[in-house]
C-alpha cells in the first residue's frame, strides 16, 4: 500500500484530547442526549470517551462498512441497523458519533435513519462537513488520517522528498 501525499497521523494521546474537546463542545450545547449511536468501527473509541464525559449510559451501534480495502471508499453496506426505540421520533435526543466524516456518505445514510439526531465527529473533511452538526478538526479532502488503532510503529518518510 502506498502512502498518500498528505498523511495526518494521530496518536492515542492526541485522539483522546480531541475526543474530550468534542465532549466539551457537546456539553456546551443546550441539549440533553438520552443515548449515543456510534457508527462502527471508527465511532467506538470516541463514543466511549464522550459517553464517560457526558455521563451517557445508553450506547448503541450502527454498523456500516464503506472502506473495504482501507484505502478507497466503496459501496455502503449496512451490517446492523439501529434499535427501533432509538429511531422513534426521528432519533430526537440521540447523539450520533463517528471518528471522521470524509465524503459524508456514511453520515448521510445514518441521517436517513435518525433525521432529528445530533451528529458529531472528531475529524471532518470538506465534503463531509455539511453532514455533521459538531466536529473538532478539519483536514483537507486529500489528507489521509491514520488513526492509532490502525497503526504500528514504523518508519515514516520525511515530508520533503529526498530529505534524509
Swiss-Prot record:
CDD domains: PRTases_typeI (cd06223). The keyword Transferase applies. Mg(2+) binds at residue 99. It is found in: Cell inner membrane. Guanine binds at residues 102, 145. Its main location: membrane. GO terms for molecular function: guanine phosphoribosyltransferase activity; hypoxanthine phosphoribosyltransferase activity; magnesium ion binding; xanthine phosphoribosyltransferase activity. Xanthine binds at residues 102, 145. GMP binds at residues 102-106, 144-145. 5-phospho-alpha-D-ribose 1-diphosphate binds at residues 41-42, 98-106. Pathway: Purine metabolism; GMP biosynthesis via salvage pathway; GMP from guanine: step 1/1; Purine metabolism; XMP biosynthesis via salvage pathway; XMP from xanthine: step 1/1. Its cofactor is Mg(2+). Keywords: Cell inner membrane, Cell membrane, Glycosyltransferase, Magnesium, Membrane, Metal-binding, Purine salvage, Transferase. One of its GO terms (biological process) is XMP salvage. It comes from the Bacteria. It is a peripheral membrane protein. It catalyses: GMP + diphosphate = guanine + 5-phospho-alpha-D-ribose 1-diphosphate; XMP + diphosphate = xanthine + 5-phospho-alpha-D-ribose 1-diphosphate; IMP + diphosphate = hypoxanthine + 5-phospho-alpha-D-ribose 1-diphosphate. Its EC number is 2.4.2.-, 2.4.2.22. GO terms for cellular component: plasma membrane. PANTHER family: XANTHINE PHOSPHORIBOSYLTRANSFERASE (PTHR39563), XANTHINE-GUANINE PHOSPHORIBOSYLTRANSFERASE (PTHR39563:SF1). Purine salvage pathway enzyme that catalyzes the transfer of the ribosyl-5-phosphate group from 5-phospho-alpha-D-ribose 1-diphosphate (PRPP) to the N9 position of the 6-oxopurines guanine and xanthine to form the corresponding ribonucleotides GMP (guanosine 5'-monophosphate) and XMP (xanthosine 5'-monophosphate), with the release of PPi. To a lesser extent, also acts on hypoxanthine. Belongs to the purine/pyrimidine phosphoribosyltransferase family. XGPT subfamily. Homotetramer. This is Xanthine-guanine phosphoribosyltransferase. It comes from Rhizobium etli (strain ATCC 51251 / DSM 11541 / JCM 21823 / NBRC 15573 / CFN 42). The lineage of its organism: Bacteria, Pseudomonadati, Pseudomonadota, Alphaproteobacteria, Hyphomicrobiales.
Amino acid at each position: 500500500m502506498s502512502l498518500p501525499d498528505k498523511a495526518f497521523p494521530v496518536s492515542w494521546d492526541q485522539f483522546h484530547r480531541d475526543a474530550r474537546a468534542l465532549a466539551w463542545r457537546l456539553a456546551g450545547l443546550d441539549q440533553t442526549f438520552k443515548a449515543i449511536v456510534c457508527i462502527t468501527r471508527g465511532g467506538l473509541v470516541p463514543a466511549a470517551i464522550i459517553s464517560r464525559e457526558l455521563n451517557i449510559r445508553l450506547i448503541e451501534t450502527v454498523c456500516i462498512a464503506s472502506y473495504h480495502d482501507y484505502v478507497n471508499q466503496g459501496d455502503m453496506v449496512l451490517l446492523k441497523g439501529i434499535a427501533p426505540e432509538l429511531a422513534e421520533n426521528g432519533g430526537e435526543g440521540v447523539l450520533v458519533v463517528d471518528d471522521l466524516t470524509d465524503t459524508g456518505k456514511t453520515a448521510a445514510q445514518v441521517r436517513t435513519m435518525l433525521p432529528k439526531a445530533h451528529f458529531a465527529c472528531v475529524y471532518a473533511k470538506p465534503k463531509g462537513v455539511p453532514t455533521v452538526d459538531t466536529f473538532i478538526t478539519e483536514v483537507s479532502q486529500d489528507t489521509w488520517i491514520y488513526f492509532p488503532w490502525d497503526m504500528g510503529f514504523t518508519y515514516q518518510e520525511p515530508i520533503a522528498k529526498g530529505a534524509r
